[in-house]
Amino acid sequence: MKRRHFLSLAACCLLGLLPGCSFPMTDNMQVEDLLRAPRLSGDYGALQSALNDWLGESAQLKYPMQGELLSPFLLQDLDGDGEQDAAVLYTTAQSSNVCIAFLQRDAAGAWKVQQTIEGLADTVDNVRLAQLQDGNAVQLVVGYLAAQGDSYLAVYSYEHGEVNAILEQSYEQYLVEDITGGGNEDLILMSTLEDGGVQIELLT
């Protein structure tokens, strides 16, 4: 009898320690699928709600694989007007590639989607900000990774509530640095040629 009580207690304790084991993990389960359900708080929660309301469905947030910015949310004064803007990386059931939503606050302080743009692949490899143009605006530099292993780079400019892709091309490595001494940052793209040589492009 004592042994039976002990086994029952041990089983209950084990179940208490493993609350996530009520369903089996399958190979096709994505981490992002598991992170979709929780409702976020603060600005992130407000951005998530604003995006879902605009889409009419629940967006799946996309996390960059590497780099300094590892969140699907980016809060920054992108257009240089002194007010904070936001960019959100996501996909939906209807989109095969990653999309980016750009949001601003309205007069009441609520986040509103201004525009969305479709990215170049289904995975975000890295994200960073760069000041590649004159003025106070900053550009969003996004590296994408396609399923077949190809890498693509896009640079987005967001001004006056509109987003434009000012660069979209394949790459192997890139660097953002003011190497010309002009005050703004420069974009250097590196790729390997068919003959094994290295091609370097400087975009200023």
Identify the meaning behind each predicted range:
Residues 11-15:
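Hydrophobic helical h-region of N-terminal Sec-dependent signal peptides
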